[in-house]
């Protein structure tokens, strides 16, 4: 339970925690950001990590004159982390996907996460790799499911790079350009919660629609 509380606190107060990391570790924070983003996109056991808000807050911190963070270097590193992470995730899904999710009672490899991602694939096809970048949890499982389904790696790689570019550039530079606005600085926590809600909302709506459609079909 302590870990759950820590994660919730870290996500909701990511601006404070990230600022503390920058103050304590300086340029080493690049490596920390790289690792967090790689784990969220590359490991199916860490779908809870806050990719969207992390990118936005990192961009906002880079805009402050009190920090030595270079937003352009940060973007390059985050792009590499996102692209390599998805590629690793795809490979894991291709090699071990069925085995990892063979236990229906698993607390870590939950079948519901795969079902949610499959719904996206049914509607959007290969473009799911791009769109999933903006939907937490689905973002982590989309490349994994692509690997399980033996999607052509050439097609996957193209979607992977496009999705990473859109996602990293949008959130990081949005934080960088809006982070200096006093109103944004004063309401950063509220904005982070808003980013999380907006990110999750499309997935929730899609699940509700799918369940209603299934209920109508059952009748």
Curated annotation (Swiss-Prot):
NCBIfam families: PRK10847.1
Main location, first listed in the record: membrane
Keyword Amino-acid biosynthesis applies: no
GO CC annotations, alphabetized: plasma membrane
InterPro entries in the cross-refs: DedA-like (IPR032818), VTT_dom (IPR032816)
Keywords assigned: Cell inner membrane, Cell membrane, Membrane, Transmembrane, Transmembrane helix
Subcellular location: Cell inner membrane
Pfam families, sorted: VTT_dom
Protein's gene: dedA
UniProt entry tagged with the keyword Membrane: yes
Cited function: Could be involved in undecaprenyl phosphate (UndP) transport and recycling. When expressed in B.subtilis uptA-ykoX double mutant, confers high-level resistance to the amphomycin derivative MX2401, which binds UndP in the outer leaflet of the cytoplasmic membrane and prevents its transport across the membrane and its recycling.
Family: Belongs to the DedA family.
Membrane topology: Multi-pass membrane protein
TM helices/strands, residue ranges: 25-45, 73-93, 161-181, 188-208
Membrane topology, Cytoplasmic segments: 1-24, 94-160, 209-219
Periplasmic side: 46-72, 182-187
Protein name in the entry: Protein DedA
């Amino acid at each position: 339970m302590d870990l759950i509380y820590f994660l919730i606190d870290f996500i909701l107060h990511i601006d404070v925690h990230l600022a503390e990391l920058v103050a304590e570790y300086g340029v080493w924070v690049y490596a920390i950001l790289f690792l967090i983003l790689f784990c969220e996109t590359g490991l199916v056991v860490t779908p809870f990590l806050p990719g969207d808000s992390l990118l936005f807050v990192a961009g906002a911190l880079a805009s402050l004159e009190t920090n030595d963070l270079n937003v352009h270097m940060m973007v390059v590193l985050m792009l590499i982390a996102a692209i390599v992470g998805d590629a690793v995730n795809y490979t894991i899904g291709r090699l071990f996907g069925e085995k990892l999710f063979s236990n229906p009672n698993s607390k870590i490899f939950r079948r519901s996460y795969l079902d949610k991602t499959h719904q996206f694939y049914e509607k959007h096809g290969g473009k799911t790799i791009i769109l999933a970048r903006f939907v937490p949890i689905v973002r982590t499982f989309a490349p994994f499911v692509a690997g399980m389904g033996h999607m052509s790696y050439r097609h996957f790689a193209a979607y992977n790079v496009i999705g990473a570019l859109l996602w990293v550039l949008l959130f990081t530079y949005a934080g960088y350009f809006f982070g200096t606005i006093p109103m944004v600085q004063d309401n950063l926590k509220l904005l982070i919660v808003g980013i999380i809600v907006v990110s999750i909302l499309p997935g929730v709506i899609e699940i509700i629609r799918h369940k209603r459609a299934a209920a109508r079909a059952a009748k």
